[in-house]
Amino acid sequence: MIKGIAITTVWVLDQDRAKDFYTEKLGLEVRTDMTMGGEQGMRWLTVGAESQPDVELTLMVPGPPGLDPESAEAMKKLVSKGVLGAGVLSTDDIHRDYETLKAKGVDFLQEPRERPYGTEAILRDDSGNWFSLTQRNEQLDLDKAWGECVDPM
């Protein structure tokens, strides 16, 4: 039986730049950084939050062995265009983290806004992927207006 989510892929344009962004700006830690299949093989690079040792993001450049050249090129265009939302990053103090990340040069598409589920800001990584940075409420408040939603494009 499935026990949880362990690894998910975030498509990036440059693994070294992505590694710097996710570790130096977002504060995640490198879990794995190795080449599989010899010197010309595929680089397997994962990062994760110290508080979640069982959950990792694989920072992958679109290409073989998983994608043929045409699909890889299409994926790179989608990533750089900012079409792909990569997920939700959780925080216990969104205003503190928003200011800290902004000071580190993280690109925010939306400043913190109240939502029925909590407060969220939308950020973009150095490849174009966007994430919701969210501080969740104890309970869902369906009476609260959603407010204006940002278009990541």
Per-range role (PLM):
Residues E56-L57, W130-L133:
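Short glycine-/small-residue motifs
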Residues R31-D33, E111, L133:
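Residue-level detector of high-confidence beta-strand sites
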Residues G48-Q52, L123-D126, R136:
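Active-site beta-strand termini and strand-to-loop segments that position acidic
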Residues W11-P62:
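Core segments of cupin and vicinal oxygen chelate
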Residues L13-D16, P64-W130:
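Vicinal oxygen chelate
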Residues M1-K19, T32, L84-L89, N137-M153:
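N-terminal beta-strand motif that seeds the catalytic metal site of vicinal oxygen chelate
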Residues G38, P116, R136-L140:
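A short acidic/small-residue loop/turn micro-motif
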Residues P53, G63-L67, Q139:
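Active-site/binding-pocket entry motifs
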